[in-house]
Amino acid sequence: MSVFERFTEPADRVMELAWEEAERLRHDYLGPEHVLAGLARQEDSHAAAILRSSGLDTQAVRAGLDRLVAQGMLPARWRNKSDLLSSLGIDLDAVQRAIAESFGTDAVCAAHKRVLRRPSRREDLLIGTNPLNGKAMLAKRAFHLAGKEPDGLGQHDIDPEHLLLGVLRDALAPVSSSWRSRRLKRIRTYLGLPGHGPSPVRLMIEATGMGLEALMDEVLAELHATT
C-alpha cells in the first residue's frame, strides 16, 4: 500500500488546499511550502492549531510565501502549462472539475493515489507527477517521511499531524543535500527554484522566531499525547 492510500480524509483535504496554494502562486509544482500552507488552512486539525500557536496561521504562511517569491527563493508567477492551454481555449481547471463531476471526487482521489504508488528509483522518492495536471510533486519526500511517523507509533493512517511532521523533517536538510542528481537539478532549474540554501519551510518558520526543531518537538508531543 502506498503512502497516499493511507491518507485520512483530513489529510486528503490538506492536499487539495496545498494544490490551491500552489495555483494561487502560479507555481508549476507542489512543494513542502505549499503543503505547509494547506495544513494551516485545514483549521480544525491539531496540526493547524500548533501552527497558529507558533504564529503560522493561513495569513502568516501566505505572507511568508509571498516574501520568499519577492526574495527569489521561490519562483515568481509565470506562464505555466495551464496558461498555455488557456491560450488555446482549454480551461484545465474546468476539465478537472468535469472529471470529478463525471466520476466522483472519491474515484478521482483513488485514481490519483494508485498512480502515486512508490516507484523503484531512489530519486523518484523525491519527486513524482500529479496525473491530473502533470505538475511536479516536489513534496514527495516529505510525504514518505510523514508515512514513517505513524509506523513508529504503531498506527496506520496518516493524519495532518503526520504530514506536518514529515514537512518539518524534510526541511531539516538544506536543498542541495536532497537534490544532487543532474536530473533533479535540471527539474529545479526548469521550475525556477534555487539549487542550494535552506528549505523554504525552514525560512518561513524561523521568520516567526520559532525554531524548526522546537516546532517538531511540539508536534511529536501532540502525537504522543493523542496516541
Question: Which residue stretches match the model-derived regions?
Answer:
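Histone-fold recognition with a strong bias for associated Lys/Arg-rich disordered tails
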Residues: 1-227
